[in-house]
Amino acid sequence: MKQIMITLTMLFFSVWQAWSQQNVIAGYPMLGDNAPSFTAQSTTGKINFPKDYTGSWKIIFSHPADFTPVCSTELLELGEMQDDFNKWGVKLIILSTDKLSTHQQWVQSMETIRYKDKDPVKIDFPLVADEDHVISKKYGMMQPNTNTTKDVRGVYIIDPQDKIRAMFFYPMSVGRNMDEIKRTLIALQTADQHNVLTPANWQPGGDVLLQSTKNPPDQSELAKQTSPDVYQLSWYLTFMKLNK
């Protein structure tokens, strides 16, 4: 009888744990989902997201806290890249659980810093105040196994139709690679524009991939090239040059 009770208890715990994990995952947005909406105050005024940004690519960055070393370097890097993001038609939104007044003080301070011996930059993108944690919980930015009051380093790339196209999560001790985020953004834009795929370690301007057929064609078909810009390494591996 005792053994049966132990077995039932272990079974109940396993089922409860699996249910809890599924419930947590189910509560977070996934790739292809509509970006959760929110209204909040920011350093540039009130934001109604994503309505204010529909029709544009946008990236939401969550960070643990203002006036912290890693977060400060990340925002200074983004400040240096503002012109590039504008060129790509991308709107940036920064979010944490800090107060709006703290955001404002932090921005003012960072705008005086000569980061990497460069002139100080003016930070034009909004920093959203999420003191009540509502937005953070909607997006899965607050993950209990890391911290219950601060966001992880989240990145959400959202397309002009307000669909989530890519997500990244970094631990609090590791700064984000802005070049990789930029690469992913341009890869998504390239894939959408040309109906192509991007290979491993692809860089903007590099050769892209075409969708492969499900079954190998005969050798005569394999030898055919529809364009001088198209080349094949195998029936399932077809590349195309976008830029000569």
Pin down the residues of each PLM region.
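Bacterial N-terminal signal peptides
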Residues: 7-15
